[in-house]
Swiss-Prot record:
Name recorded for this polypeptide: MLO-like protein
Record carries keyword Signal: no
Membrane-crossing segments per the record: 35-55, 59-79, 119-139
Source species: Linum usitatissimum
Keyword Membrane among record annotations: yes
Pfam family, one: Mlo
GO biological process, one term: defense response
Function: May be involved in modulation of pathogen defense and leaf cell death.
Compartment annotation: Membrane
Keyword annotations of the record: Membrane, Pathogenesis-related protein, Plant defense, Transmembrane, Transmembrane helix
Top-level taxonomic group: Eukaryota
Membrane protein topology class: Multi-pass membrane protein
Amino acid sequence: RIRARYPIIAAHLAPGSESRFDFQKYVNRSLEDDFKVVVGISPILWFFAVLFLLSNTHGWVAYLWLPFIPLIIILVVGTKLQVIITQLGLSIQDRGDVVKGAPVVQPGDDLFWFGRPRLVLFLIHFCLFQNAFQLAFFIWSVYEFGIKTCFHEKTEDIVRASGLVPNRDTSATQTTELSKGKLMMADTCLPTEDLVGMVVTAAHSGKRFFVDSIRYD
């Protein structure tokens, strides 16, 4: 701790003022500022959250392509950081002699894309936010509607959200046979095709069942 504190005090404070400098308070204040940047949710992240909700639409097969976006970003960012470490190592090798007390490496903005280190931080922040948002959405939908609903019609959706593979017993799935045309429910006329993938409450018995498919006789 003393070895980490002394260079900061020597570089930023006048000689003789070390006793009046509260290093712990300085570190706490710095961490609070960094915490706001790393954990804070910007309007851009909320915009991507809305796009995630809109992509969860029937027919878009989001479970096939959406999980690969954070994965590709993490692989690209990790590769870039590894390249930066390699470049810094080569720069030390090219320097030859090392002067005692001088910084061994000299990182700069030119090592990052477009000279913007914050772009890498934003991409990491984006992946963390998207993973947390998808997991929160999965937990909320299970809590509100249960595991066997139209939100989790595909097993891939559950695997994408939480890594859990449900054991769905098809023999226990309740089915219903509807006559061709319209289904009258509580003074509402609905096309039977619109009921696929929905949880329906029977008007005569009050029982709830999941409409997996429709068969016309």
